[in-house]
From Swiss-Prot:
<feature type="repeat" description="LRR 6">
    <location>
        <begin position="184"/>
        <end position="206"/>
    </location>
</feature>
<keyword id="KW-0597">Phosphoprotein</keyword>
<dbReference type="InterPro" id="IPR013210">
    <property type="entry name" value="LRR_N_plant-typ"/>
</dbReference>
<feature type="modified residue" description="Phosphoserine">
    <location>
        <position position="531"/>
    </location>
</feature>
<feature type="repeat" description="LRR 5">
    <location>
        <begin position="163"/>
        <end position="183"/>
    </location>
</feature>
<keyword id="KW-0677">Repeat</keyword>
<dbReference type="InterPro" id="IPR000719">
    <property type="entry name" value="Prot_kinase_dom"/>
</dbReference>
<feature type="repeat" description="LRR 4">
    <location>
        <begin position="139"/>
        <end position="162"/>
    </location>
</feature>
<feature type="repeat" description="LRR 7">
    <location>
        <begin position="207"/>
        <end position="229"/>
    </location>
</feature>
<feature type="compositionally biased region" description="Low complexity">
    <location>
        <begin position="378"/>
        <end position="387"/>
    </location>
</feature>
<feature type="glycosylation site" description="N-linked (GlcNAc...) asparagine">
    <location>
        <position position="163"/>
    </location>
</feature>
<dbReference type="Pfam" id="PF00069">
    <property type="entry name" value="Pkinase"/>
</dbReference>
<feature type="modified residue" description="Phosphoserine">
    <location>
        <position position="451"/>
    </location>
</feature>
<dbReference type="InterPro" id="IPR046959">
    <property type="entry name" value="PRK1-6/SRF4-like"/>
</dbReference>
<dbReference type="InterPro" id="IPR011009">
    <property type="entry name" value="Kinase-like_dom_sf"/>
</dbReference>
<feature type="glycosylation site" description="N-linked (GlcNAc...) asparagine">
    <location>
        <position position="99"/>
    </location>
</feature>
<keyword id="KW-0418">Kinase</keyword>
Length: 768
């Protein structure tokens, strides 16, 4: 009887165990769960071994055979790695782990899931290369690996997948050439990478609707074959590369917006505003460009009589010197041709000069009503230039030149100015060059003739890197008209002089400006390492996200920003538009704050003048240019001024309601940037609100929140890391009164040195 009872109990337990055993797909997902280190939202809490299958788990869907079809956990704040075991889910068709914090490489065996149709791992921290095994996913329809840290070359077999229609790989570090193919792709975004080489001629097909390869290092000409198979309504963005030559005369390219070709100084033709030079156009050329002989002379044999000129349609059967032209006739033809060419040259030169004289005379007549027709040099040390200094500037008439300057040299100089992007047509009259540092050596002609390279552009201005003949380098912003008028110059000049007096190691130095009839230039020191939105430092658009900067450099950047803002506030100024694109990095990665003072010029809004000549200089309405539009292309000497539009995510909430800027606005922007430096990702408003509840006991939580790339450097420094997080959240508090001052914020950061774990005591309290 006892044996029978034991047998019944044994079989009962066996049946229970067999009925509750988790299937193979569930076991694979449990391995995935074990690879997740942080799950702050407890989304994986329902995943356990008690179920027969994972079909009831959060983020999982199955087929009728309890096999996993979908794994979807986007925006879940998960931290971990992608396990190779996911490749064992042989029926998996859709995988979405976007906008999390998964890191590490993509395992090769991960691509054994051959049924995958949708793969989205965007906005993570995945590194390494894309394995060539991705070419085995023949059913793949959509691939989104954007906003990661992937590098290496793009697999050639990726472009050959016959079902792939959507490919998004932007904001990574891919290099090498773009493989040819992509015949069935409809959406292809490879922007903001390090791709070089040339565009392949066999690229895309009739299905293509969107192509973006902007902000790369692609060089060479645009192959004419590249648009043959494109539909006419396709969008093609080739901006900010190193492309050269003419844009193919194809409806595909002619239908594009001109800004889709900007940032390529070597490109010419429609739809850009840079026409291609036509060698046969009637113009006066320099002696170096003139062939050694005229066409008539070039057609004559080198030795008279050795190869006589004959009728090309006749057969030369009996060469006879007497059938050719006599030497006297030949000499007469040559002399006549030379005389004719000389007469034509004189006529063209006369017409050219007359037209230029007429333009200059008209301009001078208009300008005499308001100002003198000399170019004045002003400095802070003297309100007006001496006569000797004024004589150093020449009137820009087409007929006026130095004695040693030839007409061809004049034209070469004009061509250089046009290629540099500067307009030299209006350089007389009420033009004014103002230098704010006493540099009397800088002349407007010297600046306008400098070698210039386009660094970036916005709707209101273009930024150039200007290299003078003596080797000095400046950042020159050419401002658009945007309603700028001469009558505003009287208000602008004292304003820009006040801005020029703000000299600090963590501020971009304003060297001067030029106010002309058709040219408004603002001159800065050139800052070589670009801004925090440079692809070398950032991960994704719109955020600093400096994933590849060590903790020591990040702390240095935070301290420098705090010092610069504290100085501005001490001088009774407000920046009002602080964001990563306005944080520039010098040779030693010392930050320099830019974009203070230009809003006054562009908008003409009333500034709030205080005692001592200081002023409030910004409006609250901002338009934030994206990293793809500007600054991601490399060194950005000065950020773009903002025009009226949408608010920046770095603007304080109260700036929506108030037109008068406050130092608390800058504190808010600093707090958001500090949190991005700490976490290595964009910080949402919800996270800022939740983070304000950090307590002293949350040291381990602060470590988990920190960027994975710097956690090793912060070992044993949890207390200071927690203080940094609390400072960032306090600065970004939605309540202005709870934000510390920049002086207090700087005091917190100065307590810690990156190479030391000693933290000095501080009397600063958060949330006061």
């Amino acid at each position: 009887m006892r044996m029978e009872l034991i047998s019944v109990i044994f079989f009962f337990f066996c049946s229970v165990l067999s009925s509750s055993a988790l299937n193979s797909d569930g076991l694979v997902l449990m391995k995935f769960k074990s690879s997740v280190l942080v799950d702050p939202l407890s989304l994986l809490q329902t995943w356990n071994y008690k179920h027969e299958s994972p079909c009831s788990w959060r983020g999982i869907s199955c087929n009728n055979d309890s096999k996993v079809l979908t794994l979807s956990l986007p925006n879940s704040q998960l931290l971990g790695s992608i396990p190779s075991d996911l490749g064992s889910l042989l029926t998996l068709q859709s995988l979405d782990l976007s906008n999390n914090s998964f890191n590490g490489p993509l395992p090769v065996s991960f691509f054994n899931a051959r049924e995958l149709r949708f793969l989205d791992l965007s906005s993570n921290m995945i590194s390494g290369e894309i394995p060539s095994a991705i070419g085995d996913l023949h059913n793949l329809l959509t691939l989104n690996l954007s906003d990661n840290a992937l590098a290496g070359k793009l697999p050639t077999n990726l472009a050959s997948l016959r079902n792939l229609t959507v490919v998004s790989l932007e904001n990574n570090y891919f290099s090498g050439e773009i493989p040819g193919g992509w015949r069935v792709v409809e959406f292809l975004d490879l922007s903001s990478n390090l791709i070089n080489g040339s565009l392949p001629p066999d690229f895309g097909g009739y299905s293509l609707q969107y192509l973006n390869v902007s902000f790369n290092q692609i060089s060479g000409e645009i192959p004419p074959e590249i648009g043959v198979n494109f539909p006419r309504n396709v969008t093609v963005d080739l901006s900010f590369n190193n492309l050269t030559g003419p844009i193919p005369d194809s409806p595909v390219f002619l239908n594009q917006e001109s800004n889709f070709f900007s940032g390529n100084p070597g490109l010419c033709g429609e739809p850009t505003r840079n026409p291609c030079l036509i060698p046969s156009s009637p113009s006066i050329v320099s002696e170096a460009d003139v062939p050694t002989s005229t066409p008539a002379i070039a057609a004559i044999p080198n030795t008279i009589g050795s190869n006589p000129v004959t009728d090309p349609n006749s057969q030369q059967t009996d060469p006879n010197p007497r059938t050719g032209l006599r030497p006297g006739v030949i000499i007469g033809i040559v002399v006549g041709d030379i005389a004719g060419i000389g007469i034509l040259a004189v006529i063209f030169l006369y017409i050219y000069r007359c037209k230029k004289n007429k333009i200059v005379d008209n301009n001078n007549n208009d300008k005499q009503r308001t100002e003198t027709d000399t170019i004045t040099l002003s400095t802070f040390s003297s309100s007006s230039s001496s006569p000797e200094e004024s004589r150093r500037f020449r009137k820009w008439s087409c007929l006026r030149k130095d004695p040693e300057t030839t007409p061809s040299e004049e034209e070469d100089e004009d061509d250089e100015d046009e290629e540099s992007g500067y307009n030299a047509n209006q350089r007389s009259g009420d033009n004014k060059l103002v230098t704010v540092d006493g540099e009397k050596e800088m002349e407007i002609e010297t600046l306008l003739k400098a070698s210039a390279y386009i660094l970036g552009a916005t709707g209101s201005s273009i930024m150039y890197k200007a290299v003078l003949e003596d080797g000095r380098v400046f950042a020159v912003r050419r401002l658009g008209e945007n309603g700028l008028s001469q009558r505003r110059f009287k208000d602008f000049e004292p304003h820009i002089r006040a801005i020029g007096k703000l000299v600090h190691p963590n501020l971009v130095r304003l060297c001067g400006f030029y106010w002309g009839t058709d040219e408004k230039l603002v001159i800065y020191d050139f800052v070589p390492n670009g801004s925090l939105v440079n692809p070398r430092y950032r991960k994704g658009g719109g955020s600093s996200s400096p994933y590849h900067l060590p903790w020591e450099t990040r702390l240095k950047i935070a301290k420098g920003i705090a010092r610069g803002l504290a100085y501005l506030h001490e001088k009774k100024h407000v920046h009002g538009n602080l964001k990563p694109s306005n944080i520039l990095l010098g040779h030693d990665m010392e930050p320099k704050i830019g974009d203070f003072g230009l809003e006054r010029l562009l908008t003409g809004e009333t500034s709030y003048i205080r005692a001592g000549g200081s002023s409030r200089i910004f409006s609250s309405k901002r338009y934030t240019t994206s990293s793809r539009e500007f600054s991601s292309i490399g060194p950005t000497p000065s950020p773009s001024p903002s025009s009226v539009g949408a608010m920046s995510p770095y603007c304080a909430p109260e700036s929506f309601r108030s037109l008068k800027p406050s130092p608390k606005w800058d504190v808010y922007g600093f707090g958001v940037i500090l949190l991005e430096l700490l976490t290595g990702k964009i910080v949402s408003v919800e996270e800022i609100v939740l983070g304000n509840g950090l307590t002293v006991e949350d040291g381990h939580r602060a470590v988990r929140m920190a960027d994975v790339a710097i956690r090793g450097e912060l070992d044993g420094k949890q207390e200071f890391l927690l203080d940094c997080f609390k400072l960032g959240y306090s600065c970004a508090s939605p309540v202005p009164q709870k934000r510390p001052t920049m002086k207090e914020s700087l005091a917190v950061l100065e307590r810690f040195h990156p190479n030391s774990s000693v933290i000095k005591s501080s009397s600063f309290h958060y949330g006061h």
